Amino acid sequence: VSLQHNHIVVHNHIGPKVEIEGNHTLLYSIFRNLIDNAINYAGENITIGIDNYMEDSEFYYFSFYDTGRGIEEEHLERIFDRFYRVNQGRSRKTGGSGLGLSIVKNAVLFHKGQITAKNRKDGGLEFIFSLRKKLF
């Protein structure tokens, strides 16, 4: 499954001066797993947006969203749990391992950040998270 195949547009609004201190592999896994999750579960003909919308002296604050179907409110508290699947009928072949968002959360926490998820009022799912700035 790919961006082109599903007619997905990505808007990257991360500024060129954003520098994050941390483990490259874990930082990559945050964005990769969020993108994979949107591709696999948000549906077709959607937009994915990535934005560092705010910063303070220690952290950058990011919004990662899609304009897809979102999820039922009852699942929001558990989507970061290991092996949790919104649709229990999914198998590893058809719906992943249930580890992607757990990996995202643990990678964010490893970098002293926080993450939360919410449904967007116009549809889709949004992840708000923080990552520590590179200190010079």
Predicted regions and their residues:
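Conserved catalytic submotifs in the C-terminal HATPase_c
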Residues: 9-19, 53-55
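Short helix-loop "hinge" at the ATP-lid/N-box region of the Bergerat-fold HATPase_c
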Residues: 38-39
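Conserved glycine-rich
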Residues: 44, 112-113
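Short beta-strand/loop element within the Bergerat-fold HATPase_c
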Residues: 45-58
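Acidic ATP/Mg2+-coordinating residue in the GHKL
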Residues: 66
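Short conserved segment of the HATPase_c
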Residues: 71-83
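Short alpha-helical Gxxx[C/S/T] motif in the catalytic ATP-binding
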Residues: 100, 104
